[in-house]
Amino acid sequence: MIHPPAQKQAARRYTHSVKIGNLYVGSDHSIKTQSMTTTPTADVDATVAQICALVEARCEIARVTVQGIKEAQACEHIKERLIALGIDVPLVADIHFFPQAAMHVADFVDKVRINPGNFVDKRNMFTGKIYTDKHYADSLLRLEEKFSPLVEKCKRLGKAMRIGVNHGSLSERVMQRYGDTIEGMVVSALEYIEVCEKLGYRDVVFSMKSSNPKVMVAAYRQLAKDLDARGWHYPLHLGVTEAGMGMDGIIKSSVGIGTLLTEGLGDTIRCSLTGCPTQEIPVCESLLKHTTTYLNLPRKNNPFALENSESFVNASKKITKTTPWGSVYGVFIKLNEDHMLNTPVEQLLEQLGIHPENGKKDFTTPDGVVVPKSFIGTSVLKKLEQHFIVFHHHEVPCLYDYNHEIWNQEEVLSSPFVHFHASPPFIHSTRDFFEKKQGEQQPVKLVFSKDLDDECEAAVAIATEFGALLLDGLGEAVILDLPNIPLSTVREIAFGTLQSAGVRLVKTEYISCPGCGRTLFDLPEVTKRIHERTQHLVGLKIAVMGCIVNGPGEMADADFGFVGSKTGMVDLYVKHTCVKAHIPMEQAEDELVLLLKEHGVWKDPE
């Protein structure tokens, strides 16, 4: 085994180079952005046009869905057209359920993506089937027999492969033995790479996707650890599957992808946003921009990494003091002089989530605000105090590093909480602080200040750095100081990050796929309408999936599912069970509401 030079271990996990078309991925190369077309692959003109648009948007790898032989044959013409147009972008075929299509399309594309959950084995259908040790061993032999021809062909042709594990579509065999766990995801990946290793084929990239960033981060961390322990340095493609629409999708993707990038993991990335695929690329670029600081630093082990695949609860934090904001993770927004002087107080309250007519709080109203000391005693402050916990920075101790002597001063010990102002790099310095203070019981508010003007960049920055710490279980509250971002957007980012990290649920969560050539309805429009009708159902998870491939499997965490079954038809799910099939699209949204009522989770909007 040839070990990488010492300097290569600085920021990124060492990975060997994999050639995809005329492009290389691995730790010797820049992190690549990629996306997937939403056009029917058999429509060569439309697919080529969308790939050209993606390349214009600076997408570096383009993927298309290949359901069968017709789509595989179309890939030959797509590749020819791209070459004729001078478009040198690697073309990737996405395969589910149909190994014959993979064998056929490998002649025409640069990389083949397969899903271990459905390439050879059956996807888990929750039948309760029991696999004996002999059945399991026989299944592994069958896996090797069915998978080896594709491996040998890709090796012979110099084509790359992605082994893409999805949390929601583990095979029946793996689910029966390991359950719906991180261990099951890792085993699923390792079973396939062992066949590749046996045949001397190493042009492989891995992905370990989930719609839950917490699961996704834990799975990638565990796979990287297990691969490195074996001396296998395969590149990783990062993504949160079915992240959703708009700001919610950006935040959820950033919590997962951003956390891993700051830890040196990841060689290619994709933000799976519902809508036009070109919109994904600026988010990917923003993620890479905001994690550059960490990639230029010596790589550090995370003392709070989620090592245990059975538990996502970090035990290092044991806070016994009661906080003024209660048992939830607190959200505080810093107000500046412009807010206090130039915004009418009723308008300011509305921007903070207070209904102007009845004074009711929105689901994303912060727990409190931080104000300049000069406004103590003013009429504006008195209005704010009717709705929020209000304080100024000098009322509580402000710490910039952990110092045992300072921590044990009476001023700190007697305070209901302390503020921690992290120095750059925010994640590393905060982890250092909490590692040193383990055992101390004082609640800590993390202070997050960013001088950003762009709302997307602000969302990416906060969701990446604050989200990583939430996944570690650090802190009891956050103060967000984003003076150039509208207060309503600051609230959306704060609570969206908490929700994506699974720390504080304040709204309905939507698991919606980005769409591809398999999509059977107008995914963005239908998702938008369902959101409008159900957004008041706090804590509920609803999946809106374009087809049966990404439907029953990828909505692993959803309570209810709205899944395209055939053209113009929708199936409705409760958890993993289809309860209403082939509903005409024009009736399906009303039927979803009826289903929610039947299960006692519906309430009329206020």
Swiss-Prot record:
NCBIfam families: ispG_gcpE, PRK00694.1. Belongs to the IspG family. Keywords: 4Fe-4S, Iron, Iron-sulfur, Isoprene biosynthesis, Metal-binding, Oxidoreductase. Its cofactor is [4Fe-4S] cluster. Pathway: Isoprenoid biosynthesis; isopentenyl diphosphate biosynthesis via DXP pathway; isopentenyl diphosphate from 1-deoxy-D-xylulose 5-phosphate: step 5/6. Converts 2C-methyl-D-erythritol 2,4-cyclodiphosphate (ME-2,4cPP) into 1-hydroxy-2-methyl-2-(E)-butenyl 4-diphosphate. This is 4-hydroxy-3-methylbut-2-en-1-yl diphosphate synthase (flavodoxin). SUPFAM superfamilies: Nitrite and sulphite reductase 4Fe-4S domain-like (SSF56014).
